[in-house]
Amino acid sequence: MLLKKHAGKGGGREPRSEDPTPAEQHCARTMPPCAVLAALLSVVAVVSCLYLGVKTNDLQARIAALESAKGAPSIHLLPDTLDHLKTMVQEKVERLLAQKSYEHMAKIRIAREAPSECNCPAGPPGKRGKRGRRGESGPPGQPGPQGPPGPKGDKGEQGDQGPRMVFPKINHGFLSADQQLIKRRLIKGDQGQAGPPGPPGPPGPRGPPGDTGKDGPRGMPGVPGEPGKPGEQGLMGPLGPPGQKGSIGAPGIPGMNGQKGEPGLPGAVGQNGIPGPKGEPGEQGEKGDAGENGPKGDTGEKGDPGSSAAGIKGEPGESGRPGQKGEPGLPGLPGLPGIKGEPGFIGPQGEPGLPGLPGTKGERGEAGPPGRGERGEPGAPGPKGKQGESGTRGPKGSKGDRGEKGDSGAQGPRGPPGQKGDQGATEIIDYNGNLHEALQRITTLTVTGPPGPPGPQGLQGPKGEQGSPGIPGMDGEQGLKGSKGDMGDPGMTGEKGGIGLPGLPGANGMKGEKGDSGMPGPQGPSIIGPPGPPGPHGPPGPMGPHGLPGPKGTDGPMGPHGPAGPKGERGEKGAMGEPGPRGPYGLPGKDGEPGLDGFPGPRGEKGDLGEKGEKGFRGVKGEKGEPGQPGLDGLDAPCQLGPDGLPMPGCWQK
C-alpha cells in the first residue's frame, strides 16, 4: 500500500523494476499499527507526567499553607535556647506554686467598722415591676344627680277608625227658607263624637326637661369575639423549681437497620499528623569489597578564614575498611642500642640465710610515721547508757509545701433547722407619682442588717481520703553550714579488741652506722631478677596482603536511654468536646419566702374599642306628650284620605 501511494505521488517517476522483499512487505503491513500504538503510548506518558506534576505542585502548596497556618517551624535546641527554656519553665512553676498556695491559704476577715445604718447613696431606679393583682371591688357609690330630660318620643301609631253616624238620612227639602230657626233646631242634635285627628300642627315650644327613664333590662351577653393575635414575646419569667426525677422509661424497640446512605462529600484536608516514633536501627549491612585506590587529587585552594566560634561537632565517621594484609617485609637493620631500662620489680623474698654473727647495737632510729592498719573486727556492744537530758528545742523549721487538695469528703448530716427570722416589712408604699422616693424607701427597708452572731459549730465530718502525693518541689538553695555541735559524752569503754592484722610496713628509717664486718657467710643461691621493660617500638612494617572479609558481627547492645527532654510549651486548646450525658435531676428546692407587697403599678394604657353589641330590647313606651293645638273646624277641614287614596268614608257626606 505504501509503495503504491509513493508511486501515485511521483507521477512522472518510473516504477521500481525490482519487487519488494518479504521483509519490506511485512514492515509495510505492520507499520501503521505500530506507529499508532507508539503515538498513543507517548501521549499517555505525557498526560500522566503533566497530571503528576500538577498534583505535586498542589500538594506542595497545601503543605506550605498548612505549615504557615500552624506556625510551628522546626526548632533546633541550642544550649542558649535550653537555658532560656529552663528559666521560663522555672518561673512558670514558681508562679503556679505561689498561686496555689495563695488560694489554699487561710484568709482572715477583719470585722467591719462601718455603722449598722445604711449610708450608701441611692442606686439607680430598678426595672419596671410586674403588674399588681386586681383590687377588690369597692362599695356602691352614692346616687348621682338627676339627669337632663330625654329626647321627645316617636310619633304614636294611628288610632282605630271611629263608628259611623247613627242618624238616618233626612230630606230637608220640605222646609222653606223662612223657617230657618226651625230648620236649625230640627237639624242640630247632640254633640257628636270627636272627629278624626287633624293634621299635625306647627312645632310647639320646647318643653321642660323630662325625668330620666328607668334603665332597660340588661341585654344578653354578646357573642365572644374572635381570638386576638398573639402578642409580642414577654420577658422571661423566673426560673421554676427543678422538677422531680421522672421514672425510668421502658426500653425502646430496637430500630431497623437503616439503608446505606449515599457517600458523603470529601472532608477537609486534615492537619499534618504527629511525626511517628523513631524507627529501630536496622541490621548492620555486610562489609563491601575494598575499592581500588583512586588517583591522588590536586591540591585544593586555601579556604577562607573560618569564624572563631566552635563549629557544631560532626557525627563520628564510619570506621574505615581494614587494609590489605601486607607481604612480610625484609629483615630490618639492627636497631640502635635501647635506652637503659628502669630497675625491675622487687623479686620474691629469698629463703632465709644462715644466721650471721650478732652485730653491735646501732643507735635508735627516729620513729617512723604510724602505719594505718586494717580495720579491726567490731567489738562487742557495750552496756546501754543512761538516757541523756532533753536538749533545747531547735528553731522552727520552714513551712513545707502544701499538699494537693484531697477528695471532697462525704456530705455531713443535716444541721438542726435555724430559728425563724423576723417578719419583714409589709407596709404599703404610696409613691404618689414620685418613683425616686419610693425606690429610696424600698432600699432603706431592704438593707441587709448587721451580721448575726456565728452559729454553733457543726458536727465534725468524716476524715477525707488521703490526697495524692504532691509534685516534688524544686531543689532549695543550699543552707549555710551549721556550727559544730557540742562534743558528746564519752561512751563506755569497750572490750579489748582482738589482735589486729599486721600494719603496713613503715617508712625506711635513717641509714644506721656501718657495723663491724661479720664473718663471711655461706654463699647463697643466685636468683635471676625479672626481665626489664620492653624497648621502644620499631618502625611499622610494609602493608600486608589484602585479607578476606571477616564474618558479620553481632548487633551491639542497645544504648542507654537519653535524658528526658525539657517540658514542651503548652499546646493549643483542643477542640470542643462532645456534650456529656445529662446529669440526674436535682432535689426540689425549698419554697421561697413571700416577697414584699409592691407599690401600685402605673395606670395601664387605654384598651382597644370593643365590638358593637347586639340591639337591646325595646324600651318602655314614653309618657304621653302635651296636647297639640286645636285643629280646624270640621266643615272646613279637608277629608282625610284613606290608604286607598280616597276620602275617609262618611267625611264627604257632611
UniProtKB/Swiss-Prot annotation:
Per the record, what ranges lie on the membrane's Extracellular side? 55-654
What the entry says about post-translational processing?
Undergoes proteolytic cleavage by furin protease to yield the soluble collagen-like Alzheimer amyloid plaque component. Glycosylated.
Membrane topology recorded in Swiss-Prot or TrEMBL: Single-pass type II membrane protein
For biological process, the GO terms are: axonogenesis involved in innervation
Looking at the record, which segments are called Disordered?
Answer: 1-26, 116-168, 189-426, 445-654
* Record-annotated membrane-spanning stretches: 34-54
Q: Which residues fall in a compositionally biased region of kind Low complexity?
A: 230-245, 336-358, 457-466, 517-527
Residues exposed to the Cytoplasmic side: 1-33
Q: Which residues carry this modification: Pyrrolidone carboxylic acid (Glu)?
A: 113
Q: What protein is this chain from?
A: Collagen alpha-1(XXV) chain
Tell me the organism: Homo sapiens
Name of the gene: COL25A1
